[in-house]
Amino acid sequence: MEINREEIEKKVKEIVEPVIRGMGFKLFDVEFKPEGRGWVLRIIADKEGGITIKDCEEISRKVSALLDVEDIIPFSYLLEITSPGLTRPLTKVEHYDFFKGRLVKLILKEPIEGKREVVGYIEDVKNGIIDIREKEKGKVLHIPFSAIAKGRLEIEGW
């Protein structure tokens, strides 16, 4: 059986995002991939101040019932609800938009204004350009998402 992971992730995201938003959470990402001997559907959600285990259980109950009705995935899988984590890698432009205002560390593919590593706050995200206010100098850099080799959240004060 041919499995189009991206298509499944897209459909799941379209279906669960309004429900998760209606519960007061933000949908960070959806991942569907083989792990061990089976498949895992990972719903990554967050809210201001962080998400609790009880929140994950509540999301799981609602999302599980919804996915059973929609029947997008025609075989058994493990449903996992999780938070993005404190230093989760930012792998999609949407991730930067999700974490506006937060401190990030970027490793660039090529230097921009003489820098290959940038630590700063996400100011804005528009048309694939991420505006980062440098932590040290306060200067705003306009960095194309395509120029980022690695990006991750940083913990303040470490």
UniProtKB/Swiss-Prot annotation:
Keywords: Cytoplasm, Ribosome biogenesis
Biological process terms in GO annotation: ribosomal small subunit assembly; translation
Top-level lineage group: Bacteria
Cellular component aspect of the GO annotation: cytosol
Short name of one Pfam family: DUF150_C
Subcellular location(s) of the protein: Cytoplasm
Primary location group: cytoplasm
CDD domains in alphabetical order: YlxS_C
Keyword Cytoplasm: yes
InterPro entries in the record: Ribosome_maturation_RimP, RimP_C, RimP_C_sf, RimP_N, RimP_N_sf
UniProt family annotation: Belongs to the RimP family.
Record's function text: Required for maturation of 30S ribosomal subunits.
PANTHER family named in the record: RIBOSOME MATURATION FACTOR RIMP (PTHR33867:SF1)
Protein name as annotated: Ribosome maturation factor RimP
Biological classification of the source: Bacteria, Pseudomonadati, Aquificota, Aquificia, Aquificales
